[in-house]
Amino acid sequence: MATVQKIYEEMQRMAPLELAESWDNPGLLVDCGGEVSRVLVALDVTAETLAEAEQNGCQLIVTHHPVIFHPLKKLSPADLPFQLVQKGISAICMHTNLDAAEGGVNEVLAGIFGMKNWKPFAGGCGRVGEVEPITVPELARKARVELGARCNTPLDGPEVPVKYADTGKPVRRLAVISGAGGGLFEEALAMEADCLLTEIGRAHV
């Protein structure tokens, strides 16, 4: 049977920790050891995902965002790492190393949008490349459909889950970066991108 350590070693082969940004904290962050028969995969470790893992008999939670990000100065029963140990559930978190990895988050995004001849940017996390000419509104619609953004909201409804600014020019060269990429606008421009697609932008750029 698989163990926490064996699963972690396989994940490191796919997304080596050396690819992570210096400020990040990916890895096997809560190690309760032992064998693993069931795994819960989620974006974050939350009270809800922890409860779901426990209800489904999972010995391991794998997330994108680290459950321990800043150095711990104290630990209490209200803290999620404490609760994980208490319940005997380990946590592996793969963040910017998975963003930057070959076949990782941003290469998947590049594939979704049909990117060709891509190059890395944003320290290797993002991707910039050529796409078939598309308008910005069409690109926003494609993002909503392909990424399932608020899939229960009508695409032309009053609530717009994908925000965009439109220069009116077609997008032929696209930059993609998962997470908070609003600060990479100038770098995307320097790489001749017509559009930057990211999870979190900025109000003023």
Label each region the model flagged.
Residues 1-204:
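Hydrophobic structural segments
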